[in-house]
From Swiss-Prot:
UniProt function note: One of the primary rRNA binding proteins, it binds directly to 16S rRNA central domain where it helps coordinate assembly of the platform of the 30S subunit.
Family according to the record: Belongs to the universal ribosomal protein uS8 family.
An annotated GO BP: translation
Protein name: Small ribosomal subunit protein uS8
Species, as recorded: Pseudomonas entomophila (strain L48)
C-alpha cells in the first residue's frame, strides 16, 4: 500500500515516539522530510537528525526532552493532500501568539513563518509546532 501523505506520517511518528519516551525515531527519508527536520533542529525542537543509507535512505531524528517532558507539545499538519493551504505573506498564521512556529514551503525553500515574513514570501503552510 502506498503512503498518501509522507509528511503526516513523519509528524505522527515523532508524536508517537515522544509519547513512548523514545530517544530516536527512524523513518524513510525524502527531501521534504529532511528540510522540515532541519527547521525543527534550527528552532530547537529536536536535538538532531541524520540521513543514512544510499539505495533506501533513512532519516533518524534525535528527540529532545526538558525535565522529562517532550519539548514539542503540539505538532499538527496544516496543509494536506485533500486541502492544500496556501497563504500570502500577510496571511501567514502565528502559532499561539508567536510562541510556536509554522513551517512553510516557499519558492525559496522550507522555512519558518518568521523567516518567510522577513523574506517577504508566502507559500504552503505545512505544519504548526508548539
Amino acid at each position: 500500500m502506498s503512503m498518501q501523505d509522507p509528511l503526516a506520517d513523519m509528524l505522527t511518528r515523532i508524536r508517537n515516539a515522544q509519547m513512548a519516551e523514545k530517544s530516536v525515531v527512524s523513518m524513510p527519508s525524502s527531501t521534504l522530510k529532511v528540510a522540515v527536520a532541519k527547521v525543527l533542529k534550527d528552532e530547537g525542537y529536536i536535538a538532531g537528525y541524520e540521513v543514512t543509507g544510499e539505495a533506501k535512505p533513512s532519516l533518524s531524528i534525535e528527540l529532545k526532552y526538558f525535565e522529562g517532558r517532550p519539548v514539542i507539545e503540539e505538532l499538527k499538519r496544516s496543509s494536506r493532500p485533500g486541502l492544500r493551504q496556501y497563504k500570502a505573506v500577510s496571511e501567514l498564521p502565528k502559532v499561539r501568539g508567536g510562541l510556536g512556529v509554522s513551517i512553510v514551503s516557499t519558492n525559496k525553500g522550507v522555512m519558518t513563518d518568521r523567516a518567510a515574513r522577513a523574506a517577504g514570501v508566502g507559500g504552503e503552510v505545512l505544519c504548526t509546532v508548539f
